[in-house]
Swiss-Prot record:
This is NADH-quinone oxidoreductase subunit D. Keywords: Cell inner membrane, Cell membrane, Membrane, NAD, Quinone, Translocase, Transport, Ubiquinone. NDH-1 shuttles electrons from NADH, via FMN and iron-sulfur (Fe-S) centers, to quinones in the respiratory chain. The immediate electron acceptor for the enzyme in this species is believed to be ubiquinone. Couples the redox reaction to proton translocation (for every two electrons transferred, four hydrogen ions are translocated across the cytoplasmic membrane), and thus conserves the redox energy in a proton gradient. NDH-1 is composed of 14 different subunits. Subunits NuoB, C, D, E, F, and G constitute the peripheral sector of the complex. The keyword Ubl conjugation does not apply. It is found in: Cell inner membrane.
Amino acid sequence: MAQNFTKLNPQFENIIFEHDDNQMILNFGPQHPSSHGQLRLILELEGEKIIKATPEIGYLHRGCEKLGENMTYNEYMPTTDRLDYTSSTSNNYAYAYAVETLLNLEIPRRAQVIRTILLELNRMISHIFFISVHALDVGAMSVFLYAFKTREYGLDLMEDYCGARLTHNAIRIGGVPLDLPPNWLEGLKKFLGEMRECKKLIQGLLDKNRIWRMRLENVGVVTQKMAQSWGMSGIMLRGTGIAYDIRKEEPYELYKELDFDVPVGNYGDSYDRYCLYMLEIDESVRIIEQLIPMYAKTDTPIMAQNPHYISAPKEDIMTQNYALMQHFVLVAQGMRPPVGEVYAPTESPKGELGFFIHSEGEPYPHRLKIRAPSFYHIGALSDILVGQYLADAVTVIGSTNAVFGEVDR
């Protein structure tokens, strides 16, 4: 089968079919339930085995980067919620971290504690969501029901803090919008206990389930060479045995002060990746347990103090003329960062999420580029799927934990 297609015409119009009873071309998605209307795979099959896979993306493209180049820095923050919408706080933070690096802001310690707690809470919510829907795709429905019940407790905590359950907008450039509500940390401790129990329950349902293991073991194997050549990150990379975690390699916020491990896999298959998600939940619980006592030892400020870029506290805006004028200018005209470029990587639940910003000293970025992990992992399907059975395609796609809000952007 020869494929000489151009970008101007649909791919199927440019495929020359040769008479071969053992080979066929199959459209997988975008209507297939596991592709959620956002992924099309053109699969070439020989019998039941995939001999070539071509991912086609773009069904959720909204021009997020170009939007960022036409908004002020603060206006763009809620848009980042819509990238990886299962872990929106991670997107908020990655963008804020890039802008803060450009501005050279010093973040108050209480804001750092709150941010790190929110990031790890968000990581657990994202991981438990992935495990539940991945199990549902493979056919284990009970896990979905138990996991979503526990996930609701985490979403309740996010709602108590910022008022939203999915698109949080819980981070600000320079800090956080709110201090923790009364008794919020007590609710967090209770949630950590619920998460531990849920994890044990899921492991009891899956770890010794021979059907689950047959569907995942030696399926979707990623080698170290493949992971490095495709620019994989996160659990897709660590599943191959490479212990690379940006929280350890280039620590931000309070991670350099925290004691936690970076779990790695041995075989790089789908089962290894599932195990790593479960182990990372333990590490997030461990991190939050270290952060809770830190909170009481911090001072009250939760926003950086820099009148050129950050508005004064609301009490000052309501009582002081200069603070009101400065706030008006920042809202109406936007902050003007210095001329320069910055790339700030973070470890999101999916992998390396980074924002590149090129500033010309204007109220909006001259160029904004988002380095989203799911984009690279979906591209790698053209290698991972080769040699797999068609029945295992859903397992492999699910094990990448890709979210198409950040693939298409």
